[in-house]
Regions:
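Basic, polyanion-binding surface patches
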Residues: 1-126
Length: 126
């Protein structure tokens, strides 16, 4: 099992540091002052500071030469209550200030660019 802990702007330094350091050589939780917490459905811990934690059970591991690809089922998702809209029970992505990593660079996420179905919605006639 494993957990995908999505990180945000506040965790950017820790995200990068943990990505370039080996857990064989460092206690990443201790070094980056992160809090491990028991997950609800899997043995791997979640990171308490993470806005969103996705708990997964491994189905298959595929060897791809230089690395492995894990095929898994998502068995639970935990969201930090600070980012849940109490009126709709929806995760407020823009408030969470999540980050993404691509080709050596980190990016901010969260600006809404449309709502579901906007691409096919017909213009209303007056």
């Amino acid at each position: 099992s494993f957990v995908i802990n999505l990180t945000n702007e506040d965790m950017a330094r820790a995200t990068d540091w943990c990505g370039v350091r080996s857990g064989k050589d460092y206690n990443k939780f201790q070094e980056m002052h992160l809090t491990p917490q028991k997950a609800q459905k899997v043995a791997a811990p979640i990171i308490l500071e993470s806005p969103l934690s996705i708990e997964c059970e491994v189905l298959e591991i595929k060897e791809l030469g230089s690395h492995h690809m894990f095929i898994a089922n998502v068995v639970n998702v935990q969201a930090d209550e600070r980012f849940i809209d109490p009126a709709t029970d929806e995760f407020r992505l823009s408030d969470a200030k999540l980050i993404a990593y691509s080709h050596g660079h980190y990016y901010k996420l969260g600006e809404e660019i449309g709502k579901f179905g906007w691409s096919v919605r017909k213009n209303k006639k007056k």
